[in-house]
């Protein structure tokens, strides 16, 4: 079986796909899916999904995916799973960036990072053998784990709170008010790289 070394971003995307975080997306997107999601925020089957989920590969490594049933994924020198490639393609990055972010200039961190991705994209299902601990992963619950917690606690009404900022007193006030009205509160911090100043 061919293998490829993947980045931390790719590793986290593999985990999110495999554990169902990106539901209803179950595999790295093909060209039609990426274009439809970027232009209309829906999958070809008309289910809503806001952002392309892609697996990028360099020109040097793309040969590892050609005529392969599956390709081993290596992260931090350990095999973490495999990808079953279904399609290899090149997309129009400027067009995708314009559709997703509203412009295609490199002064936006998301656009800049997207432009830094490799030339080729591979679609296909991923299987992850085991999560490698990365700082916060012990607090990262899969959708199925969250559903079990909700069942165990017998919550009937649940509200979500999503933030990209460090929690402060205003957040605490809002969360306490929400818990007066709802059985449970799920906090979803958006964690990622920040723009360098």
Placement of each model-derived feature along the sequence:
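Nucleotidyltransferase catalytic core that binds NTPs
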Residues: 1-197
